[in-house]
């Protein structure tokens, strides 16, 4: 990587990111701007993927809201996310959990592991 680009991105990397993987349930505190007001919106769900590396790393969180699946993709190092809390760790054998989109109810549960 170009040394100039590398030096610019190192200053923007966040150090307060917890260790989480696909299958973990996380609570994301995202900043939402509505007009002139800014508030924190909590989005809690299962991490179904992580992709990329460095400043461009992203993760996708899926939750069921009103019987409908909702997915949001967040950059890991964005200032729009106030904090990320890991609620529980899940035991999965895949890096991408896109198969959860087709499952409903108890079939979509992920076994919890103690870390």
Swiss-Prot record:
Gene3D superfamilies: 2.30.30.790. The keyword Ribosomal protein applies. One of its GO terms (biological process) is translation. One of its GO terms (molecular function) is structural constituent of ribosome. InterPro entries: Ribosomal_bL19, Ribosomal_bL19_CS, Ribosomal_bL19_sf, Translation_prot_SH3-like_sf. GO terms for cellular component: cytosolic large ribosomal subunit. Pfam families: Ribosomal_L19. Keywords: Ribonucleoprotein, Ribosomal protein. Belongs to the bacterial ribosomal protein bL19 family. This protein is located at the 30S-50S ribosomal subunit interface and may play a role in the structure and function of the aminoacyl-tRNA binding site. This is Large ribosomal subunit protein bL19.
């Amino acid at each position: 990587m170009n040394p100039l680009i590398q030096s610019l991105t190192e200053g923007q990397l966040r150090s307060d990111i917890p260790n989480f993987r696909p299958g973990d349930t996380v609570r994301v505190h995202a900043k939402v701007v509505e007009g002139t007001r800014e508030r924190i919106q909590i989005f809690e769900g299962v991490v179904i993927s992580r992709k990329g590396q460095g400043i461009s790393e992203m993760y996708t969180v899926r939750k069921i809201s009103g019987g409908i699946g909702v997915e949001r993709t967040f950059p890991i190092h964005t200032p729009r996310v106030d904090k990320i809390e890991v609620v529980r760790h899940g035991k999965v054998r895949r890096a991408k959990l896109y198969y959860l989109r087709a499952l409903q109810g108890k079939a979509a549960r992920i076994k919890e592991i103690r870390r």
